[in-house]
Amino acid sequence: MMGGPRRRGAPMPRMSIKRQGHILKRLMKIVFENYLWQFIAVIVCIVVTAYATIQSSTFTRDLVDVYIAGIQKGTKTMGDLANAMMPLGCVLALGVAASYIRQRLMVSVGQGTMLKIRTDLFTHMESLPIRYFDTHSHGDIMSIYTNDVDTLRQLISQSIPEVINSAISVVMVFFAMLNNSWIMTILSLILLTFQMLASAKLAKLSGKHFVAQQANLGRVNGFIEEMMTGQKVVKVFCHEEKAIEQFGDLNEQLRTSAHEANRWANTLGPINNNLGHISYVICAMVGSALSIATGGTLMSTGRLVAFLTLNRSFSQPISQITQQLNSIIMALAGAERVFNLLDEAPEADNGYVELVNAKEAPDGTITETTERTGLWAWKHPHTADGSVSYRKLSGGVTFDHVDFGYTPEKTVLHDITMYAMPGQKIAFVGGTGAGKTTITNLINRFYDIQDGKIRYDDININKIRKSDLRRSLGMVLQDTHLFTGTVLDNIRYGRLDATDAACIEAAKLANADEFIRKLPDGYNTMLTGDGANLSQGQRQLLSIARAAVADPPALILDEATSSIDTRTETLVQRGMDALMKGRTTFVIAHRLSTVKNSDCIMVLEQGRIIERGTHDQLIAQKGRYYTLYTGNAIGE
């Protein structure tokens, strides 16, 4: 195919605060739409847990000032202390239960949200045009499903609840501190300001590196995927050392960004802890001085102990929030990549002409039917009067002065004009980059043309729904892709409602039945690893069977016999000949001997048709085709 190189991943700029807020808002919208009540229950559990913590801290004031002092003076007994602690014990037990329920709920919310996001990702990915997959590394896309989605799981199930828990705790503890001593509370806020400024600075430094880390991780995964797919090519050309060198460069970029991100992130915890200790010491010193100076009037011993406990409960959530900032920033970087994929425009389709099962009356009238009759027709609605007309599908394809380029800057097909009559075999030959595969990509509308018209049975293909257009076209490719499943499942992929008998009949037509029955479990043999336990020729025979079971009126055979031995090629060719019988067929082949019997051979060079005619006519012209054929040149 003529086109630009696939990119492993574009550089990711540092996200602004506004962009981070937008992504977080969008993510939480997904959570609220699916798990609103569970999330509300989580908030309630957080409030209960925070309340239990505060009650525990404030009880220390009464413990020292009322009960310990009272027991020493003889005004209180141990029984009074036990009675006072029983309600506290119930509150603390309730806090433990609430914390447990919160954890269970967030696991459910987190995993459920990931299920929703993965489903949305895959559903949307299936709607994307081929252009997207031609220009994006498959490994990078896989990294979105694995690494980026997993960071979102951690964000939803851990980071966000922790931040909410810390925020609620801070607010509740603040009012408890204010109730205890407003003077000491102001002092704590002043000390907290320095802690927040230091945390914000460090989070800013680490944030940009976390974004780069996610992007570099996608590039590494993309490179690994490419090397795994092309491992045979790597070994044939002894490219192992170069591949290791390239991987080392990408891996070093990942290490550098991860090191920088974690270097600053890991500094946050110790700094916050030390600042919290300093705040505790200063508050203890000032509180002690205040208690001594006022004789316990403004700050009793119990009130001081309670305040210091609250101060610890106040600074600890702040420290937790700053520590979670790194996870949040990294998760938001992953979320941006997830949403970038979800925001990719789906494949546009303005077609309205449908392909339907039909039957023909003796007078030639075509009517639609729900039964599979072997006769197909185009259903053409007319908006002017609301009527519907039917035209029998015959398989005629016309190119009328077609120009096309994968990018607006570069046209790769120039003024392509041709006509394939129903049932004809049209062959494309030419050198690498001549435009042969590009033409077939235009027939099934993997790409849309910039100029000219393509008609299918005299209908502009832009008016035909893409799904119906592609249903009418069978494809057999050189690089046959088989899916994990049985042989029967892989044949049935051509038509999901096909019976076992129909699949076996298609295999017989493709000359595949004989080798299939010799497999360990015959048609029920499980294929894995893209059919790695089959030969290239056997895989192509299955591909032919898959196309045969779909029973399409038109075929595209893209280089289908270029990498198999002569004996297997004979089997494959017989299968293809049986499949092509009565169908309009477009063939691209390396070996010109396979297209000698074509009704018309198109010779392409630099995106232009320079010769056309039958094999004998082109040989007689002694032009480019003659040179390719007599010189045993390979046409790709």
Feature locations, PLM:
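Juxtamembrane helix-loop junctions of ABC transporter transmembrane domains
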Residues: 13-21, 45, 52-68, 91-138, ...
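Hydrophobic alpha-helical transmembrane segments of ABC transporter permease domains
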Residues: 25, 44, 98, 146-191, ...
